[in-house]
Amino acid sequence: MKLIVISGRSGSGKTIALHVLEDLGYNCIDGVPFQLLAQLIDTVDPKNNKVAISLDIRNLPTDASQIQTLLSSLQQKVEVEIIYLDAISAELIRRYSETRRLHPLSKNKLSLSQALELENELLEPIHKRAALSIDTTTLSIHNLNERLKIHLQGSTKSNLLIIFQSFGFKNIHPDDADYIFDVRFLPNPHWEPTLQKYTGKDQPVKAFLNGHLVVKQTINQIENLFHSWLPYLEENNRNYVTIAIGCTGGKHRSVYVAEQLAAQFKQKYQVQIEHKGLKDQL
């Protein structure tokens, strides 16, 4: 039997992750008391060979050694894989302000920021054992769904997942990027009145940028760079690499370049595109 454990700080997207696993055929159980986890595994019908549970601060012991001991004992019985979700504290606070929910640790007379900091410490024993950690700070529900499905379902392509991100320097910088390319030197469609309302995914902007040699050269140079580097990253057992492309507002140039690069690499690699300036967050 395979047991997937979804954990992470409150507001990081665990419920969404469980819904994805349910769609993939997992028997999902939310909020299992930690002390009953071993008993649950012993009583699960053997036919249910794929089980997923969520573990959060509400159902964990305060003694970290108990967490380590139980996880180790479970791994002797079944295949256990931990997926840990998190986001920067400022984003978690924003999500809480929208839902107006109380943090589970707020009953200890802690502020929300203090509760999140304590929660981070208490969950660290689980985080350290995670096979996959996902930062959901700027992920849409669709992107989180896609990231989990690629990880769990596998692919006939290379195991390396390439994440192309577009962003605007005047907005948010991608803290999770491995490589960042600044394309603000490229011709800017923003200064063309007829193009301002479009994005780098729309044909008028694509035609404008495709008509400039420097844009084509830039894309080719980035493409050639990673055609050379990616095999070495694979040899070092990298699971994914994040390549961020930034322009001023994250609407035109960076979106176009990210889309073009993704199209070039998707034949051989698993590819995901995240346009931080265009989409809603979790």
Curated annotation (Swiss-Prot):
GTP binds at residues 56-59. It comes from the Bacteria. InterPro entries: P-loop_NTPase (IPR027417), RapZ-like (IPR005337), RapZ-like_N (IPR053930), RapZ_C (IPR053931). The keyword Nucleotide-binding applies. ATP binds at residues 8-15. Keywords: ATP-binding, GTP-binding, Nucleotide-binding. GO terms for molecular function: ATP binding; GTP binding. Pfam families: PapZ_C, RapZ-like_N. Belongs to the RapZ-like family. Displays ATPase and GTPase activities. This is Nucleotide-binding protein Ping_2894. It comes from Psychromonas ingrahamii (strain DSM 17664 / CCUG 51855 / 37).
